[in-house]
Amino acid sequence: MTKQALPHGLWPSPISPAMLAGGIRLNDVQWSPDGNFLVWSQSLDGKTSLFAKPARDAAFDLSGELNPSGGVGYGGGDFFAGRQGVVFAERNGRLYFKPYTEGLARPITPAFGGCASPVLTPDEHNVVFVHTYENKDVLAIVPLDGSAWPRILRQGADFYMQPAVSPDGKLIAWVEWDHPNMPWDGTRLHLASLDLETGSISNVKLLDGAENTPIFQPIFSPDGSKLAWLSNAGELDQLKLLHLASGEVETLVQDRVLMPPAWVQGIRALAWSPDSQQVFFLENQLGRTSLQSKNLNTSEITTIDTTPFTLVEQPCVSAKGEVALLAQSARKPPRVLRITGGEVEVIARSQSDVLPAAFLSQPEAIDWQSSDGVTVHGLYYPPANPDFEAEGAPPVIVYIHGGPTSQVFDAF
């Protein structure tokens, strides 16, 4: 087909701004501990909803008229998927529990302050969470049935995020930091003994982190023998592993870009295989992210095939070995994916794939030298239209990301 000549900027397109702006925003995805339910969070027109999908049945709405939304800092950390139901933070400042089966969501905390990053203890009798009230952040714990007032587990730092409880319920790890640092500047990773009967912690140990060393996402192995996390003590990141019995710390992966900036609560980049022999991690290269796995027995690193998607986020692995994550590319709108034995299934979409790919530009990773000799990286989006062409170079529109940690990705 012969293309029609028309100057750049005048090519008609079937893609309208309304089509691009009208999609659903996918926020997070998690497996229930037994792998029987896949739960995700999505937002549309200012309303966030939780959906759950059983293995062989259709997805259903969990949150109804409630509006799940983390209330600490800039948000995030909306929910935690348990075996029997979901614990979520509501915009009114309370934590709620909603069973997967029949029954209404019920509040489990009083309505004051804000909650985020709820974590059910393994017996599912208690919830650990981050709470803020009158500019004071703490780690707290509350019975799942709401029968008692929340108790403070840890206070004293200015900020807290990413609490994690060991599979036996006897240990807790978290990240904390103080003004004027941001979480990508410098944080501290702590490990402590957890007493669920008294709702208290003891034997607090500093594992990693400093004023200039940020830490990200402590996560216990399913067998409870190890704790993994991301650290940045230098130019690039490290994936570290603590053997809880011996106290030995080893570096599994280093000199890669692994740690996303913790702009909000609830961001994840790590996951464990159900046999505790593989650690899954995200790697950022040239504006694209990929899912990798590190085999602890062979030390081999394997790339999980998520083709054709170029930005993957929020990885999680079920007790049955199924991977779920959020994925998108420049020509594929965001969606929730389930990966089972190499087979990829779309569980939810931000919008349908009705947009013709030929009208969507495919970015190319490029770099150039600035006037002061610094290598600058970018994504070049060439004009894309199967029906039109133009003479000469197109006009250049330069979009520079904001802030010290923001980045432009090869994404929709």
Region locations from a protein language model:
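Beta-strand-rich domains and repeat architectures in extracellular enzymes and scaffolds
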Residues: 10-51, 71-80
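A short beta-strand motif characteristic of beta-propeller blades
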Residues: 14-20, 60-69, 104-110, 149-154, ...
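Residue-level detector of Asp-centered blade-edge/turn motifs that repeat once per structural unit
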Residues: 33-34, 81-83, 122-123, 167-168, ...
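Hydrophobic beta-strand positions that form the internal "hydrophobic ladder"
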Residues: 38, 86, 127, 172, ...
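A flexible loop/linker signature enriched in serine peptidases of the S9 family
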Residues: 42-51, 67-73, 87-96, 110-115, ...
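Short loop/turn segments that connect beta-strands within beta-propeller blades
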Residues: 54-56, 99-103, 143-147, 195-197, ...
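Serine-hydrolase catalytic core recognition
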Residues: 219-221, 312-322, 326-412
